[in-house]
Amino acid sequence: MLGYKWKRARLSLKSKRNKDEFELKQGQINDLKQLEDSGYIDLYYGDESHFGLTPNVPYAWQLKDKPLLLPAAKGKFLNVVGLMSRKNDLFFQVLESTFNTDKIIDFMNSFVEQINKKTVVILDNSPIHRSNKFMAKIQEWKEKDLLIFFLPPYSPELNLIEILWRRIKYNWIPLDAYLCFQNLKERLSFVLNNFGKKYDIIF
């Protein structure tokens, strides 16, 4: 149809956010990108994502008389926390349980030990990022050259790691990953460990 194209619809949070705050933070992130491009800092985008046995795109080429049947499995899942740079560097951890503040703090503590220059991590306003425990660690990390930059509410498009999660879920994980939990673990691990090599994103 003229003027239309077939594509996946996305949910939008634009109506809920503060436009002025969004534009301010967007400008600050652009400044951080320039500092990174000049070599003054490293810049990472952080987030958590959930992976279960229900495929995000249940479409595949199938024989007409042999449809591909996926088990209706629920319950088991994987959670990934990651820090991604525009250079396709990825620091991540996978858990078979939910993340909480203590686990995120441990993850950030591990990350700060391997940075070698002033580093900024961009995070959303998830409760585990804004908890008293997490906020109490910010000064300690700052003293180790790790700074936290919080996004404005309802602004996922400013967090580039959201693109990574979409690519993994909609493009990179093969459909057979959802046949069983072991397959999911193996396929997800392969993608995560090969990001920046076999899999990449041009920002």
Language-model regions, residue ranges each:
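Short functional hotspots at interaction and active-site rims
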Residues: M1-F203
